[in-house]
């Protein structure tokens, strides 16, 4: 029966949802083109080693062997292939690229998610300025505004915040690892046991509140100002504060939150990272951030980079269907092909009626509740 079923985690796409998805891809692609980004496209198959830095819990790539016995995978990520491309060509950064394509990740059984995901995004490579983050967030905000996505929440985090606090605490490697494991896993009882010996540390009041430091940006910044030394706020939080101010100026309708308790989505993130969702949504619509170690697996020289990726499937599910337009069939004799095609081109939701007789055309229109435009000469109708 396997020839009648799809592999777990895959689906066919057709009908109104497929149309919505294709229109969405076109809208996002045009936005990136108009913003001056250059198109880039990498192969669906890559060598497994390209994705060594990738760490996605509970997920594995689809894997196979090529004719030389080398392990190749269907790409589970679209950022690392761009790092591979830069390291193996004479392209000189900075570059501003946009892409659209599918990634494949074998998820846990019964997870309720799909293994094939369509993404569209941008990569700004070679830019150290905070303006690169702002450029990504600005493009995302404009696209969401164009799509009419309201009640959007954008959550900002910093991949270096936890490491900086741990350095300030001067923990040894084993203690730091145990601390991070408990903290990110939200194992609060273990976390409380780990911070108990630090009761005399000036950061102890902060450590007690840290697991709950997520939510409205103004509230979180006020708490941090009360709990942390000013140098920590200046060093690590200033970029977050500036980014929040930028977003509120550009997109006042956007709800911006801060989460200083979340683990970076990948180990190669080195600064601000973000994701967005709508009220009641269970998937991120877009995500991204800074990763200044982009080429670490490919060459000695590192490059600063910021990226943004839309989950096309998640966004598609948030968009309404286009208003129903009555289907219209256009029927004509073979000699009227050009006239019939011209009629289809100027009639909303019309298509050629590919049958041989008017009676068949009428039956097809009735079956699909469609209008029928008959171009055949009256004398040809018996």
UniProtKB/Swiss-Prot annotation:
| Gene3D superfamilies linked to this entry | Bira Bifunctional Protein, Domain 2
Subcellular localization, as worded in the UniProt entry: Cytoplasm
| Alphabetical keyword list | Amino-acid biosynthesis, Cytoplasm, Histidine biosynthesis
Role played = Required for the first step of histidine biosynthesis. May allow the feedback regulation of ATP phosphoribosyltransferase activity by histidine.
Instruction: Share what the entry says about its subunit structure, partners included.
Output: Heteromultimer composed of HisG and HisZ subunits.
The Swiss-Prot or TrEMBL record describes its family as follows: Belongs to the class-II aminoacyl-tRNA synthetase family. HisZ subfamily.
Descriptive protein name = ATP phosphoribosyltransferase regulatory subunit
């Amino acid at each position: 029966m396997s020839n009648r079923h799809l592999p777990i985690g895959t689906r066919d796409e057709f009908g109104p949802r497929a149309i919505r998805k294709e229109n969405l891809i076109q809208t996002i692609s045009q936005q990136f083109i108009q913003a001056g980004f250059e198109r880039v496209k990498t192969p669906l198959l890559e060598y497994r080693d390209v994705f060594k830095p990738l760490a996605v819990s509970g997920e594995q790539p689809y894997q196979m062997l090529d004719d030389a016995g080398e392990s190749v995978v269907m790409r589970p990520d679209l950022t690392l292939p761009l790092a591979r491309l830069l390291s193996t060509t004479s392209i000189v950064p900075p570059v501003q690229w946009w892409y659209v394509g599918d990634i494949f990740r074998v998820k846990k059984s019964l997870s309720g998610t799909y293994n094939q995901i369509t993404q569209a995004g941008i990569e700004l490579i070679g830019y150290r300025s905070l303006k690169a983050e702002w450029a990504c967030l600005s493009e995302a905000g404009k696209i969401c505004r164009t799509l009419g996505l309201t009640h959007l929440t954008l959550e900002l985090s910093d991949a270096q915040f936890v490491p900086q606090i741990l350095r300030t605490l001067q923990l040894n490697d084993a203690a730091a690892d145990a601390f991070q494991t408990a903290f990110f896993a939200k194992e609060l009882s273990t976390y409380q046991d780990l911070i108990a010996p630090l009761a005399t540390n000036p950061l102890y009041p902060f450590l007690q509140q840290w697991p709950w430091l997520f939510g409205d940006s103004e509230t979180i910044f006020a708490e941090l100002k009360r709990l942390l030394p000013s140098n920590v706020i200046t060093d690590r939080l200033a970029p977050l504060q500036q980014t929040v101010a930028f977003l509120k100026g550009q997109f006042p309708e956007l709800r911006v939150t801060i989460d200083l308790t979340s683990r970076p989505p990948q180990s190669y993130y080195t600064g601000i990272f973000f994701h967005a969702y709508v009220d009641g949504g269970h998937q991120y619509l877009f995500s991204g951030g800074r990763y200044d170690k982009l080429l670490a697996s490919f060459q000695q020289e590192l490059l600063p980079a910021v990226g943004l990726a839309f989950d096309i499937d998640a966004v598609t599910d948030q968009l309404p269907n286009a208003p129903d337009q009555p289907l219209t069939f256009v029927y004509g004799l073979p000699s009227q092909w050009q006239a019939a095609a011209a009629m289809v081109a100027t009639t909303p939701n019309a298509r050629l009626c590919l049958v041989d007789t008017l009676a068949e055309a009428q039956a097809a229109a009735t079956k699909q509740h469609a209008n029928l435009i008959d171009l055949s000469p009256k004398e040809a109708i018996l």
